[in-house]
Amino acid sequence: LSSRTPHCSGFPATVSCCRAGSAPSEPGAWFALQVPGNFDSPSHTLMRGLAESESWSGRLTGVLRHDVVGEAAEYLRIMLDAGCDADAWETTYLQLLPGENAVLEWVRGAGLRPVLAALSPEEARVFEAEYSARLAEAYPPSVHGTVFPFRRIFAVARKRE
């Protein structure tokens, strides 16, 4: 599954392999997922807040999603409703990121891409400077690096025999 699309709207079809009597999967078939669950963390709320600010909303309205993935309980319910034996859980990894602007560098890998794509190079530079200042307050660096809590959601399902 991709964390760039709303999961739970199309997720039941994805898990259809677990529905009793559905072809071509066999009883005992497994389905597993892991997705980032950090869309309510400061790295993302600060990005959305800045994008929604008076300075940026004209260019960035609708660019960032608020509900990118579901919660572990939602995935569990969908899998159980599909006739699977299932389990779901979450873990928060404390990533130690090296370097200056470590969290900004991290979110450039995926979360910040839609913003940067919607802006001119000069606008992107200004946005990143404002965003970086906010991130520095939320994620202060230490002599060891910058601690970045990264929540992941996991779920597994097995088609009932």
Stretches with model-predicted labels:
Residues V15-W30:
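A short glycine-rich, Lys/Arg-flanked "PGG" loop and its adjoining helix->strand segment in the class I
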